[in-house]
Structure formats: C-alpha cells, structure tokens
Amino acid sequence: MASFISFLLLAALIGMASWQAIAAEPSPLQDFCVADLNSAVRVNGFACKNPTNVSADDFFKAAMLDKPRDTAVNKVGSNITLINVMEIPGLNTLGISIVRVDYAPLGLNPPHTHPRATEIFTVLEGTLYVGFVTSNPDNKLFSKVLNKGDVFVFPKGLIHFQFNLDPHKPAIATSAISSQNPGIITIANAVFRSNPPISDDILAKAFQVDKKIIDLLQA
C-alpha cells in the first residue's frame, strides 16, 4: 500500500513538472522561423516560411527610424512607429520589437498597456514624465522624470504613459519590447470607443458620473 501511495505521489510530481515545462514558449529548435504572413495555418504566432525561400530582406526594413515623425496626426501629440513581426517577418518567434515615439511639445503617449510584453524605454531627446500603475488592489503609481539618455522599464501588462513636459520643444524616445507582437490597448479607446459601444449605464456606474458625461466621451 505504501509503495502504491509513493507511486501516486511520484506521478503527481511528474505531472506538475510537465505542466510547468510547457507553460513557457519553448526554446528555438532552428536558427529562425521567418513568418509566412500569407499562410492559412493558424497557430499562436505565424507559421514558418520555407527556409529555402528566406532572404536577407526577411530580416530587414528601411524604417528610417532616424527621421522625425509628424506629431500632428492626432490630438494627443504623439506618433508611434512600431517595428514588429508584421514589418520584419524574421522577428517571428524571436520575442522582440522596437518602437520610436515622437512627442510634440506637451505631447502625450496616453495610458495604455502591452498585454504580451515588457518594455524598456530610452529617452533620445527632451524631458519626459513617465509612469506605470500596479494592479488591484494597490493601484500604486511609479513615476519618474526622464532626461536624454535615461532608461525606464514598464512591466508586462501594466498601464503606463509618457508625457513631454516641455511646452516648446519636441521629444523623442525609443523602446525595446519583449515580444514580436506585443499588442497595445489604449485605455480610453478601449473603454469609450469599443465596437460595439459599452453601455453608458455600465460606464456611468463604473466611473460614478452622469450618463451625459459618458455620452460625451463616447461621441
């Protein structure tokens, strides 16, 4: 009887170890897996392109990340250039993307989250106020004023933002992001501009404001 119980315990431990082993993305079993963006195969990511058809262009993009972007394209005064697997298919399975962010004077990259990635953020020009908020129940704000050359980390999945403090000069930053397809959820857009819209009754109760204010925000 004792040996049978020991066997059951051993089987349970092996099962737990196996579950933990498959919980993370496996290590690469080949040099690369260039995304076949036209493949009909649906997997968690993209199917691999036939390696005999891979060229150097699959790992390259003339992104001109050294060139300033137009920050008047939206009302918040920022322009984001994301280079991910959709831009460079060779990034598939490699777990990294790069971003350039341009800020107008007093420009904002509004509160948002990357559900699949951590971000390491570097200021190239200007002075930015940045921060992130922890999960419930604390909702603690960690914030910092960054100058040229400073680096800040935004943990995976947490809401974060950047704001150009200078009313006269633009700012520039770049980020490395720990996913080839990090995703982005802009909080205001997700809540007030979902498709179809979230009921104004729900939002009015959630934010404890009059429905007229919600209707205005959703307009």
From Swiss-Prot:
Protein name, per record: Putative germin-like protein 8-1
Similarity section: Belongs to the germin family.
Sequence ranges assigned to domain Cupin type-1 in this UniProt record: 63-215
Function: Plays a role in broad-spectrum disease resistance. Probably has no oxalate oxidase activity even if the active site is conserved.
Pfam families, sorted: Cupin_1
Binding site for Mn(2+): H112, H114, E119, H160
Glycosylation sites: N53, N79
GO cellular component: apoplast
